[in-house]
Amino acid sequence: AYYDLIIDATNQVLPQANLRVIQTNTIITEHDFKKIQSVCNELLAEKKRRIFHDKLISFMDPQLFEKNHYENSVEDMIRYMAEKLVALGIAPEAFTDSVLEREAVTPTSFDNKVAIPHSIVCSTQKNIGFVIVNEKPLRWGTFDVQIIMMIGVNHQQRMDFKYVYSNLL
């Protein structure tokens, strides 16, 4: 569809599937305006959720989800995850060292129990996310994390990465 919303002051538009119709007075009142504004905000939020969902799903591969995989250190966890991406042909050989270099600059952990390690350069064949969810936390910088999402970024798809990354935090 080319439009998401019809504003009808004639009360002659019939409701349609997947299309919102707002009935208003012939001369739009404050109440009508608030109703329009509310529906527009809902539609924008739905669209943002849909875009985020689609971009996030495009990062995911079922073989790159693991539960309760533990390593002795952050470095070992990064090596394990990055080397798996290399072995699958998704990331180049230099990927592991690039992720470790990035992590050395500042830890990629956050106070919401999530770490998002990623490479300094956009070098993977496609945008990819490798997720490990652990019951027991791993100390990662100043935070304990239970969800590790290693991100590989493709140069041509880097704006999608920025969008997903900013919406994950």
List the model feature ranges, each with a label.
Residues 4-5, 9-169:
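Cytosolic covalent-transfer regions centered on His/Cys nucleophiles
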